[in-house]
Amino acid sequence: MTPTHSIFRQTLIECKKIGDAYDYLPNGSANYPFLYTGEMINTDNSHSDMVGTMNQTVHLYGRLSDRKTLMEYESKLHDAFKRMRHAFGYNLSMTDYTTQLLQDNTDIQPLLHIVMDVSFMYTKGEQLNG
């Protein structure tokens, strides 16, 4: 399995521990709040799958009345990502983490949209210090 897919899968597993989570943007029948494991960027430092940096974006959507729940989800995910050390044969360390809280008016009702950008350093088959 590639490092990109490994980290994506582990990230989705962590999201599903917190709430309703998808690996695609669900249609309008999904209940709010929900999490969506989305875009990813892989910076391959060695031109192999041995070492690199992976940026994973996670989206949290909810109604305006879900603000407290969304903030709790974001906090729990931050802690879970910080603790993540392994993903399907790769060792991980979270190296960067940013969030944005956005107003989203694409639905009939106004929504809150949290965008979490998480960077992981990965190595294959060796333990990371830390």
Identify what each model region corresponds to.
Residues 36, 59, 117:
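Conserved beta-strand segments that form the floor/walls of ligand-binding pockets within enzyme
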Residues 1-46, 72-79, 84-88, 129-130:
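Small/polar-rich, solvent-exposed N-terminal microdomains that initiate assembly or binding
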Residues 29-30, 61, 96:
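Non-transmembrane, interaction-prone segments in cytosolic or luminal domains
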Residues 60-64, 120-122:
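Short beta-strand-to-loop capping motifs
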Residues 1-10, 40-53, 93-130:
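Short, charged interaction patches at domain edges and termini
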Residues 65-72:
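Short, conserved charged micro-motifs
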